[in-house]
Amino acid sequence: MQVYLVGGAVRDKLLERPVKDKDWVVVGASEADMLAKGFQQVGKDFPVFLHPKTQQEYALARTERKIGQGYAGFECDTSTNVTLEQDLLRRDLTVNAMAMDDNGNIIDPFNGQKDLRNRVLRHVSDAFEEDPLRVLRVARFAARYASYGFSIADETKTLMANITQSGELSHLSAERVWVETAKSLLEDTPQIYFETLRECGALKVWFAELDCLWGIPNPAKWHPEIDTGIHSMMVLEQSVRVSHKLSVRFAALVHDLGKGLTPPEEWPSHRGHEKRGLVPINTLCERLKVPNDCRDLALLMSEFHSHVHHAFKLKAATINDFLDKCDVWRKPERFADLLLACTADAKGRTGFEERPYPNADYIWQAYLLAKEVNVQEIVQAGYKGAEIKQQLRQKRIHAIATNVA
């Protein structure tokens, strides 16, 4: 029975990146052997065990044979005869197909170290094509390691396109797609994930509402980058600078989906795209089973980003009604996130990246002023029923007006 550190832990150790999770592979052991040593079995599809002390994952060395469609369509062999090299052969990329023994020796049968040095993401074997999830995983790795200078090998891009053309991507579960997408959104260069998927044709399979934005023009005066798809990627890139939150980055990504529904004869104008975007955002979120907090912020962002962009032109009453519609009184943190996403939108344009965006502070200040209005004082003044709400609105508008002035 031999134990090896494998996969991402070895890769990141060699890259001198922090190692977050350690995965181990066990060669020459059976399920009974692992249970006898006190390990707890947790894997449903194949035998994975938790170490009794560290709770790290230990998997029996295995081979895989494709027998069906999608991510789960595999038959596994975890017999004691499976070698380490056979286990590494089934992995996705050469940089993930290395192992380390107890003495720190690297076992690298597929030249993963060479690809690490050359900053290349390359598939291990043609079996790569058997698992459609790998298209998303490689796109995620491309997003994670872009800042290290990594790029995807041309032959691997070809296999990713082949998988897309085969129709296999549609057999993935929504949950799997969202997990990979959410992880990618939290990387330092999340736009690379979506650009990679678009390059191999995969974006239109799961993100059709986003994919259709490329080629749709915006007015050059406000969008020197012109293309709505490019703008969406620039906004996502800027969202990394303003927030670590998944909901903010997702809202930044999908804020302009309404422009995909603008009649071409109206281009490059997109009047009304804000509310038009609500349907495609809901459709996308239902398809991917996006968490409610991400969906809700994305819907607010779509409907109201133009309000924030035109903040200095809005009347006090309009600002107050906008605050009401955003439910800021009960959800101020979400409203703050909306303003962050709007900041990313404003800066996600060619030549606007470093320009100040005072609109967000202006709207936040209006909220703080309106928040100071004391409803108890209105009640104590003798107002009742609908009068209370009316007085509260008037006093808030008056408070906001001091900021507008």
UniProtKB/Swiss-Prot annotation:
GO terms for biological process: RNA repair; tRNA 3'-terminal CCA addition. Pfam families: HD (PF01966), PolyA_pol (PF01743), PolyA_pol_RNAbd (PF12627). Mg(2+) binds at residues 21, 23. ATP binds at residues 8, 11, 91, 137, 140. Its EC number is 2.7.7.72, 3.1.3.-, 3.1.4.-. The keyword tRNA processing applies. The keyword Membrane does not apply. Residues 228-329 form the HD domain. Keywords: ATP-binding, Hydrolase, Magnesium, Metal-binding, Multifunctional enzyme, Nickel, Nucleotide-binding, Nucleotidyltransferase, RNA repair, RNA-binding, Transferase, tRNA processing. Magnesium is required for nucleotidyltransferase activity. Its cofactor is Mg(2+); Ni(2+). CTP binds at residues 8, 11, 91, 137, 140. It catalyses: a tRNA precursor + 2 CTP + ATP = a tRNA with a 3' CCA end + 3 diphosphate; a tRNA with a 3' CCA end + 2 CTP + ATP = a tRNA with a 3' CCACCA end + 3 diphosphate. HAMAP family: CCA_bact_type1, CCA_bact_type2. Catalyzes the addition and repair of the essential 3'-terminal CCA sequence in tRNAs without using a nucleic acid template. Adds these three nucleotides in the order of C, C, and A to the tRNA nucleotide-73, using CTP and ATP as substrates and producing inorganic pyrophosphate. tRNA 3'-terminal CCA addition is required both for tRNA processing and repair. Also involved in tRNA surveillance by mediating tandem CCA addition to generate a CCACCA at the 3' terminus of unstable tRNAs. While stable tRNAs receive only 3'-terminal CCA, unstable tRNAs are marked with CCACCA and rapidly degraded. Belongs to the tRNA nucleotidyltransferase/poly(A) polymerase family. Bacterial CCA-adding enzyme type 1 subfamily. Comprises two domains: an N-terminal domain containing the nucleotidyltransferase activity and a C-terminal HD domain associated with both phosphodiesterase and phosphatase activities. PANTHER family: MULTIFUNCTIONAL CCA PROTEIN. This is Multifunctional CCA protein. It comes from Pseudoalteromonas atlantica (strain T6c / ATCC BAA-1087).
